């Protein structure tokens, strides 16, 4: 067994100071270049059904076999090299495009790549967009696509935790509620004892997005992330059914009730709105 000398972060360098804030946020397992597992699932105690039972985190992971596993192995090797030699210049190859396909972000090499793909799928939606994410403060590209889709009559639903971890991230998410609901976006807060950690989207029961990125600036613009995009009605149906099951453990935020929230909450959201651009 070999372990990388990196702990998922990049050491400080005066030549590359911005890279200090980057981290490897991917959740990827590849077995013999035959099968890959990816999504939001971390290998940690909080995900153990034996230790936490029904209190474990609510997450989504997917398993895929075939050529895509070899592509995932190549992406892993590239990240391993970057961890061992963080400031070396490595040539990158796009590789073969598969359906479904993997979308990596390498910060400066893939700046806004995942955000643009997310927004592009939402912009092409015709009937419904169901998004599950622990944090929703994605920046203007995705935020605008979500609101415009709702405005043109698409059934847009956003599932986020009621209680965020850490708590202040909830201020960032909630600071955008009013604007989204004004455009017709339906917002649901997950209230089950389990913490919501899944990062998925399903568009028109057909296009599916599963991976490691949260819909926030750190994931979309800074971190090393990996996402699967698939046009698969079978997977889309499964994700839609899971979304409906999650809604049974969620409560919808109603615009009239939201307008009556207290000034303390409004003040915290104002702080969150200001911080959205950096977090």
Outline where the language-model segments fall.
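Charged, low-complexity intrinsically disordered terminal segments
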Residues: 1-279
């Amino acid at each position: 067994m070999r372990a990388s000398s990196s702990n998922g972060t990049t050491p400080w360098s005066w030549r590359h100071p911005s890279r200090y804030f980057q981290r490897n946020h991917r959740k990827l397992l590849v077995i013999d270049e035959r099968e890959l597992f990816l999504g939001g699932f971390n290998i940690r105690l909080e995900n153990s059904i034996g230790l936490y039972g029904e209190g474990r985190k609510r997450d989504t992971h997917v398993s895929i076999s075939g050529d895509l596993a070899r592509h995932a192995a190549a992406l892993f090797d590239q990240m391993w090299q970057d961890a061992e030699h963080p400031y070396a210049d490595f040539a990158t190859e796009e590789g073969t495009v598969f359906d479904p396909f993997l979308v990596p972000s390498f910060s400066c090499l893939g700046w806004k790549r995942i955000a643009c793909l997310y927004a592009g799928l939402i912009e092409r939606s015709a009937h419904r967009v169901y998004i599950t994410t622990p944090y929703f403060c994605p920046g203007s590209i995705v935020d605008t696509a979500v609101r415009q889709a709702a405005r043109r009559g698409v059934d847009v639903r956003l599932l986020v935790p009621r209680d965020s971890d850490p708590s202040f991230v909830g201020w960032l998410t909630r600071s955008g509620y009013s604007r989204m609901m004004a455009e017709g976006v339906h917002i649901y807060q997950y209230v089950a004892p389990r913490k919501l950690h899944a990062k998925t989207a399903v568009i028109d029961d057909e296009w599916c997005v599963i991976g490691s990125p949260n819909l926030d600036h750190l994931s979309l613009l800074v971190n090393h992330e990996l996402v699967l995009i698939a046009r698969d009605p079978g997977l889309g149906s499964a994700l839609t059914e899971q979304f409906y099951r999650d809604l049974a453990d969620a409560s919808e935020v109603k615009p009239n009730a939201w307008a009556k929230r207290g000034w303390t909450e409004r003040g915290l959201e104002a702080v969150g709105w200001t911080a959205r651009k950096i977090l």
